[in-house]
Amino acid sequence: MRSTLCWITLGLWIVTIVVAGWLFVQGWTTQGTDRRMQIVLAPAERDLILGEMRMLLKAVHGVVTGLAGQNQDANRTQMEQAARSAGMDMAADVNPMLMAKLPLPFKQMGLSIHAEMDALADAIVQNETPQQILQRLSNMTVRCTTCHDLYRFSTEH
């Protein structure tokens, strides 16, 4: 009897781990009508993610605006602050339940963008050339467009 209970417990534990692992990788997704993967979120979660994307875009705009300015030395502080505002600190407080709903490739792309924003801020402080900074931005924004090509958000009904 005791052996059977142990096997049942072990089986349930394994099933739980497999399901949790599958959800961690897949997230809460369905196939969209436009061939993109739909990430299913609550309306407030969707608004939070879209707001974060807008903040990332504003950070890119802040860096590009600084590069376009005449006074590069004065603009470096503005550029560094813009990039740093979208770094890993921005992603630190995301609700773990929300993160669980996101598919693994989406999480990887998003976190890599935040990490590279911090690296961009460091590069600005270290006086990388405008060309080097633009190359970094280009490497980041290609992931943004890839993500938008692959995913879309829908809300729970």
Regions of interest found by a model, annotated:
Residues 62, 119, 143-146:
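Solvent-exposed, charged/polar functional surfaces in cytosolic regulatory/catalytic domains
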Residues 140-152:
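The canonical Cys-X-X-Cys-His
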Residues 87-88, 125, 144:
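Helix-capping and short linker residues that terminate individual alpha-solenoid repeat units
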Residues 68-74, 114-138:
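Amphipathic, charged alpha-helical scaffolds that flank and support histidine-based chemistry
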Residues 49, 137-140:
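A broadly tuned, weak detector of single residues within folded domains
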Residues 1-114, 155-157:
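N-terminal export/targeting leaders of redox proteins
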